[in-house]
Amino acid sequence: MNVIETIKKILTDCPLMDEFNNNIHIDYMSLGDVKEMDTGVYPLGTSLVSGDILGNKKYHINFSVFADRKAYEDYDRLNNSGFLLSLTYYLNQLKDIAITENVNGEEKNGVITKISAGNGLLFSVPSGDINDGVTYQIQIGVSYTIFK
């Protein structure tokens, strides 16, 4: 699996994400439909960080992850903030995850060396009415190496 597929799988397998019923999508979600409890994983681009004398390349990719949640009362919003905090702690402890990338038509092995998550916040109220559900965002950065 490449780095994008791997991040989707990490989120799908995360016990904190059980309530989303495997509704985790890449570059899509039905914004504001709290009945669906969707999550959208949006890759924001990959940057080459460095290379070494052996030909290994270090990259960094950022993601925005959006999740629909109910937010009727302060209790719900506090619970949502706690969810984002727990997800941040969960993701930040992950490392050394094997990946495979297709580079110029050739399959290359690699490893995720670090995942950093943060900036979890209430992103939008899609319908304009907080009682219809809201969308939260968390940002994820992934550092990884592709071996020659």
For each feature predicted by the language model, list its residue ranges.
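Charged, amphipathic alpha-helical segments and their flanking helix caps
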Residues: M1-N23, G45-K148
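Amphipathic, interaction-prone secondary-structure segments
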Residues: M29-D52
